[in-house]
């Protein structure tokens, strides 16, 4: 798994920036996979979180994830971006399915 990198990016509202885990290089049988055959990971480390969704009361809703958490997210959720040569995903908190650990 890639080590989470500190980034200069502040997501808005209930958005979270996740650094995806590295895709598997080989299969369980030892076959080396080319980049075109690797499945995109659905797991990663949270590297930045927004301040929370603005509620009707004017307060901000607290996010249930924080920087350093390892999360599982939906396959088609979020937007892919590149920051300092690293692939990242910007997800809404609702795109995150589970927190590991």
Curated annotation (Swiss-Prot):
Primary localisation category: cytoplasm
Domain of life: Bacteria
Keyword presence, Transport: no
Keyword Chaperone: yes
Annotated compartments: Cytoplasm
GO molecular function, one term: ATP binding
InterPro entries reported for this sequence: Chaperonin_GroES (IPR020818), Chaperonin_GroES_sf (IPR037124), Chaprnonin_Cpn10_CS (IPR018369), GroES-like_sf (IPR011032)
One Gene Ontology term from the biological process aspect of the record: chaperone cofactor-dependent protein refolding
GO cellular component: cytoplasm
Alphabetical keyword list: Chaperone, Cytoplasm
Subunit (UniProt): Heptamer of 7 subunits arranged in a ring. Interacts with the chaperonin GroEL.
Family statement drawn from the similarity comment of this UniProt entry: Belongs to the GroES chaperonin family.
Function statement: Together with the chaperonin GroEL, plays an essential role in assisting protein folding. The GroEL-GroES system forms a nano-cage that allows encapsulation of the non-native substrate proteins and provides a physical environment optimized to promote and accelerate protein folding. GroES binds to the apical surface of the GroEL ring, thereby capping the opening of the GroEL channel.
Protein name: Co-chaperonin GroES 1
Biological source species: Rhodopirellula baltica (strain DSM 10527 / NCIMB 13988 / SH1)
Gene that this sequence comes from: groES1
């Amino acid at each position: 798994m890639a080590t989470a990198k500190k980034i200069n990016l502040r997501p808005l509202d209930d958005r979270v920036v996740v650094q995806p885990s590295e895709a598997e290089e080989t299969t369980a049988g030892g076959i080396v996979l080319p980049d075109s055959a690797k499945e995109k990971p659905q797991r990663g480390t949270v590297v930045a979180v927004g301040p929370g969704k603005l509620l009707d009361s004017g307060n901000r809703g607290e996010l249930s994830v924080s920087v350093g958490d390892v999360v599982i997210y939906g396959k088609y959720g979020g937007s892919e971006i590149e920051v300092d040569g690293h692939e990242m995903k910007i997800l809404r908190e609702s795109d995150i399915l589970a927190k590991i650990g």
